[in-house]
Amino acid sequence: MDITRRKLIGYLLSGAALSVSPFATHAADALLVPFGTLPSPQKAHRVLSAGAPADLLLLALAPEMLLGLSSFDFSVSGSEFLSDTIRKLPKLGRLSGRASTLSLEKIVSLAPDIIIDCGSADETFRSLAQRTAAQTGVPYVLVDGKLRDSASQLRQVGALLGVSSRAEKQARLAERFLQDAEHFSRMSGNSPRFYSARGATGLETGLQGSLHTEAAEQLGLINVVSEPSQHGLAQVSFEQLLLWEPDIILTQDANTYRYITQNALWKNLQAVRKGQVLCYSGLPFGWLDSPPGINRLLGMRRLQAHFDSKIQANWMDDLQQFFRLFYHSDLNQTQLQRLLEAG
């Protein structure tokens, strides 16, 4: 038996498996839900990300503490817009989401001081966090990842990791974007009705109130796909789309955009015929949706700029500032032009 497996079994048999922290019994709307005894900010030097939204939060706040990324492999592509520190991070696999690819043995061998996840904080993810902390002996923090709470997420996780100064600068930019979005939502009058298109044929979508459509909904745009008892993703039929007749169609996938704009069936929708299909593919991560992390601040800002000339006038400066603060990268003119074309 190798030492990693022996150590893991030791946790489970000796009673060293962590009990739930008292903080974990907080109300369901708590922003940070910890499991286990958290390290002090001065001792949290090795941080493990549990999923893609946490990757984005942590590479913004503390890339030097990250052991690696859960979902992105920058040795393949997408790293030219990021700092050297981020570019060198390995892909380790993910804990949360569909089909975990990171084993408990691997977690123990990495010896993190803390595991952080961000996104949905429902009972499924709380159960995973509690179980992982108990089985590995590593404290785990679940961050409720709603877009409107981005500034608070940055401040609270920044304080947890001892990087409050950096977090405050990021939080202030997030607050400015969100406050402008809130003002726009109140002043826009008849809000456009939108459909968020995902997948090869555009018939996967985010339900109203889901993490996947917050960037548009934060601006007051109305999601045509609403199911009060459900959140998350759903498959719809084209017949349903014809009944909904959205004013605009949003996507962040260039292949989805091409399919929608070139397929004869989709031309039955007024939004397609009128050229109201907006594609914000973004780089190096999706801007509107995937992953549903703080990267969506950019998608929200870009979408507001489409409707608001005052925001459009400063879009280039906002884009540069976001990359400087969140991705620790000063864009050159070539990179900036590529981003403007992608968004």
Question: For each predicted feature, which ranges?
Answer:
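Solvent-exposed loop/turn segments at secondary-structure junctions
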Residues: 53-56, 72-75, 120-123, 146-150, ...
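A short, structured surface patch at a secondary-structure boundary
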Residues: 54-109, 114-123, 221-224
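C-terminal segment of N-terminal export signals and the immediately downstream linker at the start
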Residues: 1-2, 22-39, 47
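N-terminal export signals
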Residues: 7-28
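Alpha-helical, coiled-coil/dimerization segments enriched in small aliphatic residues
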Residues: 208-232
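Extracytoplasmic substrate-binding proteins
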Residues: 30-31, 37, 41, 126-204, ...
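Ligand-binding pocket segment of bilobal, Venus flytrap-like solute-binding proteins
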Residues: 225, 232-256
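A ligand-binding cleft/hinge motif common to bilobed small-molecule-binding domains
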Residues: 122-133, 251-267
